[in-house]
């Protein structure tokens, strides 16, 4: 069984947000995890990149290099800062050097030639004239060597091909969205060519999936993938079937989409589900909805999300070489907790528990002509969700669609003048990508009308203590907890209980925006 599907767990730590300090550096805003000998220092940089004023226009290699060197100058400054803080690895975002929205032709001057690191051992900084059109690789190599750290960056690359190659494009070359990895001495260690392209006409999909893993002296094996890849089995999940891969470097250019797929939501959920450290570097263009980076462990996150700041942001954190595992759900069921005991009784089909749970206090809730909450449909994430309103101070509600039934057992210290709803979706998502999902989600609606449920919101006042669960038919389930002001929260407990996957949370730090269990059925894509 995958690590995502193992029995889960009581999470003992809270999330932490990276905070800015003078000089542009960001450090964790709460105490570090207990010190262990086997730890390393990681850095990710969210980059406000310099972009081509007209990415569709044809330009020269010299003009392209002028733009890219401006971005590389910023990278070099961040490597210097990270080195002073003891960073052993740094990750930069997707598209951070060259930008985006090119055509296949207009991006050509921005591409470096890319030899295969598996067949050619090369240090671009020390051997700059070995291959033509490698100026970007040379600078990145020199940064890694000067900073004495592993460096991961994303750039466009080209690879000539012959007409005898049945996959060779008509212009005689492959163009790839490529991550490169340099060791601390500047050697090109490996590359990853993006497999799941997201409307990227400038690039080709590799004929075979790269399953890129590189080894480090300070933390063992790291996997590599890019942006949209995180939603698919290949290469992301297949990489993690290697039990020795406990860390992932993840350049991304992610456009946030609430309520379920903000960058930090999926990053955090992925780290928890697979019990790994995820080093995620996003591009920073708030006007395009692009922000959200972090160093995520199974128990804690150091992250940055800002729609206001025009500046890039460096995050540095010390994390464990062996990410702390999750405590067995069987050892942490909290049977002495009356609220959790009621949840277990509901799973067991205790009719008295069901009666008690549905005894909803409706003093501040809309009146209904029936005892059951009305179901309704609303668009969320371009999908047709079936939902029920969550009214009153406490209760148990459930909603089903196509065999997936989602349940919510909840208590509220006070009832805010906001509408919340429990939603379910079990089907093929077909907008901006095609993939099969099973989702149970408690969301704050954009207004008081049912048709506002699923809208993008970031602020909320509603406080909850709850169990959220469903009869998922996949073991790949990503837990998501987001509160007011784009703050990440950690579940108190989550796991399998009586063939139901559940998430438990008490003591939110601020109003709930989204609590979700986001399941992927890769085989049904």
From Swiss-Prot:
Show the coiled coil region(s): none
**Where is this chain glycosylated?**
132, 185, 384
What keyword terms does UniProt attach to this protein? Glycoprotein, Hydrolase, Secreted, Signal
Q: Which enzyme class?
A: hydrolase
Question: What InterPro entries does the entry give?
Answer: Biotinidase-like_euk, Biotinidase/VNN, C-N_Hydrolase, C-N_Hydrolase_sf, Vanin_C
Biological process terms in GO annotation? biotin metabolic process
Protein location: Secreted, Extracellular space
Keyword DNA-binding assigned: no
Would you identify the family this protein belongs to, as annotated? Answer: Belongs to the carbon-nitrogen hydrolase superfamily. BTD/VNN family.
- UniProt-recorded name of the protein: Biotinidase
């Amino acid at each position: 069984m995958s690590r995502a599907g193992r029995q889960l767990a009581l999470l003992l730590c809270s999330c932490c947000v990276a905070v800015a300090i003078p000089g542009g550096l960001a450090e964790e805003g709460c105490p570090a995890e207990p010190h262990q000998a086997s730890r390393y220092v990681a850095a990710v940089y969210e980059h406000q990149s310099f972009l081509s004023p007209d990415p569709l226009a044809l330009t020269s290699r010299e003009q392209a290099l002028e733009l890219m060197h401006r971005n590389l100058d910023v990278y070099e400054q961040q490597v210097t800062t990270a080195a002073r803080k003891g960073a052993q690895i740094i990750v930069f975002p997707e598209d951070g050097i060259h930008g985006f929205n090119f055509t296949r032709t207009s991006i050509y001057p921005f591409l470096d030639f890319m030899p295969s690191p598996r067949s050619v051992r090369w240090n671009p900084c020390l051997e700059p004239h070995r291959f033509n059109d490698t100026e970007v690789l040379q600078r990145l190599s020199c940064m890694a060597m000067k900073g004495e750290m592993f460096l991961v960056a994303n750039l466009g690359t080209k690879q000539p091909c012959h007409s005898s190659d049945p996959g060779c494009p008509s212009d005689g070359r492959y163009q790839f969205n490529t991550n490169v990895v340099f060791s601390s001495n500047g050697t090109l260690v490996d590359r990853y060519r993006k497999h799941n392209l997201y409307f990227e006409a400038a690039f080709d999909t590799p004929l075979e999936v790269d399953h890129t893993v590189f080894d480090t002296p300070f933390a063992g094996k790291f996997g590599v993938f890019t942006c949209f890849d995180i939603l698919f089995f290949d290469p992301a999940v297949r990489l993690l079937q290697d039990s020795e891969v406990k860390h992932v470097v993840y350049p991304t250019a992610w456009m946030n989409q609430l309520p379920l797929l903000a960058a930090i939501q999926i990053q955090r959920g992925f780290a928890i589900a697979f019990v790994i450290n995820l080093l995620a570097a996003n591009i920073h263009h708030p006007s395009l909805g692009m922000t959200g980076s972090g160093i995520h462990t199974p128990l804690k996150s150091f992250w940055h999300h800002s729609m206001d700041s025009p500046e890039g942001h460096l995050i540095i954190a010390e994390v464990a070489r062996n990410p702390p595992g999750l405590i067995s759900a069987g050892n942490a069921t909290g049977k002495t907790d009356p609220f959790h005991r009621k949840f277990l009784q509901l799973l067991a089909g205790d009719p008295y528990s069901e009666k008690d749970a549905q005894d909803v206090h409706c003093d501040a809730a809309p009146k209904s002509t029936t005892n059951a909450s009305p179901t309704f449909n609303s668009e969320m994430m371009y999908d047709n969700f079936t939902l029920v309103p969550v009214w009153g101070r406490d209760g148990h509600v459930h909603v089903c669609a196509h065999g997936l039934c989602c349940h919510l057992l909840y208590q509220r210290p006070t009832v805010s003048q906001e509408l919340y709803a429990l939603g379910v979706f079990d089907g093929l998502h077909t907008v901006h990508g095609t993939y099969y999902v099973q989702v149970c989600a408690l969301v704050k609606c954009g207004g008081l009308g049912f048709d506002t449920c699923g809208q993008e919101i970031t602020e909320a006042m509603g406080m909850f203590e709850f169990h959220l669960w469903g009869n998922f038919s996949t073991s790949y389930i990503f837990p998501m907890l987001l509160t007011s002001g784009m703050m990440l929260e950690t579940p108190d407990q989550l796991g399998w209980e009586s063939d139901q996957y559940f998430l438990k949370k008490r003591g939110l730090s601020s109003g709930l925006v989204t609590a979700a269990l986001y399941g992927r059925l890769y085989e049904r894509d």
